[in-house]
């Protein structure tokens, strides 16, 4: 559903959607290096090399959305009004928007910290815009949960967490 909502918003064809070159994985499918605490998801960029006769052939970015189940479930337990489906939908929409913005060169993956914070606000605003325009059961508490991000930016403890390295891992994938 997240893919459909985001691709409809950005008016992406099925072919364009495939060209985003990404995958979404949950905790069961993540390696140790892909698991983080205090974040609901992270995007890791891998360099995907096509198998060709030329060893120095082209490399294409592959984005892996690493869903952090443990952090999501902790938030669901802590905040009674958060619904798992609506919360997960928000998270995946948010991460897909990041990938689209990376692919359209609207944001650099390796941007400096202050730019990443500004980008988080922009992406939260866009996520709210997309999810506000559809009827989804229990989405309002989720939008309220993230409301601070759409107004003044992240709260200080989130800034500190982001400064410690969120969304900046690069790995090579053969």
Task: Describe each region flagged by the PLM.
Residues 5, 9, 130-137:
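Solvent-exposed amphipathic alpha-helical surface segments
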Residues 66-69, 95-104:
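A short mid-domain helix/strand-loop element embedded in enzyme catalytic domains
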Residues 29-39, 126-129, 153-163:
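Short, charged low-complexity intrinsically disordered segments located at boundaries
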Residues 71-76, 118, 139-143:
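Conserved binding/catalytic microenvironments
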Residues 132-174:
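Long, well-structured alpha-helical subdomains associated
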């Amino acid at each position: 559903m997240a893919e459909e909502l985001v691709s409809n918003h950005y008016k992406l064809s099925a072919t364009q959607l495939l060209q985003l070159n990404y995958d979404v994985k949950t905790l069961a499918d993540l390696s140790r290096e892909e698991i983080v605490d205090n974040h609901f998801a992270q995007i890791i960029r891998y360099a995907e090399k096509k198998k060709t006769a030329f060893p120095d052939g082209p490399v294409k970015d592959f984005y892996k959305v690493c869903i952090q189940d443990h952090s999501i479930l902790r938030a669901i337990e802590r905040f009674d009004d958060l619904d798992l489906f609506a919360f997960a939908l928000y998270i995946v929409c948010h991460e897909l928007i990041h990938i689209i913005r990376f692919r359209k060169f609207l944001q650099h993956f390796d941007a400096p910290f202050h730019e990443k914070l500004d980008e988080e606000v922009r992406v939260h605003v866009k996520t709210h815009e997309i999810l506000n325009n559809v009827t989804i059961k229990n989405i309002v508490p989720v939008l309220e949960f993230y409301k601070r991000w759409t107004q003044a930016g992240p709260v200080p403890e989130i800034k500190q967490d982001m400064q410690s390295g969120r969304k900046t891992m690069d790995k090579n994938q053969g």
